[in-house]
């Protein structure tokens, strides 16, 4: 009987440790459909749901989530940018302190594309990883990135 009780206690402790692990890792890595931090993401398309447009020209628009400092950075196509992020329950994304260098693009269309990107990123409300894609959405639109 003592041996059985000991086995039950071990199972209970293992179950409790598993639950604690899930609770403490919550919506960080992997809970939003997959890993998104410490990966360089490249923007493929942006816009409103059902009306996405591809990135214009040879613009290299990127996004990095730095997990240790909870910072974002990347290229908007013309300018480098930076900010802070937090993940709240259910993969809610909050981006704060978004700033960028102030170089002008020679191409007005690329400058407008960058401004649209920054507006959508600034108003981001959620993120989801779907396979090799990262989807960020909010009140201003949707951003679709690939690894």
What kind of feature is each model-predicted range?
Residues 1-2, 26:
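Intrinsically disordered, low-complexity regions enriched in serine, threonine, proline
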Residues 14-23:
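Bacterial N-terminal signal peptides
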Residues 11-15, 71:
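Hydrophobic alpha-helical segments
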Residues 22-147:
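Lipid interaction determinants
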Residues 2-12:
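Positively charged n-region of N-terminal signal peptides that target proteins for export
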């Amino acid at each position: 009987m003592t041996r059985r009780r000991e086995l039950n206690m071990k199972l209970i402790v293992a179950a409790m440790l598993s639950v604690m692990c899930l609770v403490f890792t919550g919506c960080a890595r992997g809970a939003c459909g997959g890993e998104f931090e410490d990966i360089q993401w490249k923007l493929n398309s942006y816009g409103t749901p059902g009306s996405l447009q591809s990135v214009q020209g040879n613009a290299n628009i990127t996004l990095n989530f730095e997990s240790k400092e909870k910072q974002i950075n990347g290229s908007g196509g013309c300018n480098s940018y930076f900010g802070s992020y937090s993940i709240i329950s259910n993969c809610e994304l909050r981006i704060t302190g978004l700033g960028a260098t102030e170089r002008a693009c020679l191409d007005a269309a690329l400058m407008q594309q960058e401004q649209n990107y920054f507006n959508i990123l600034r108003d981001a409300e959620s993120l989801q990883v779907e396979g090799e894609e990262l989807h960020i959405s909010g009140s201003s639109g949707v951003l679709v990135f690939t690894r």
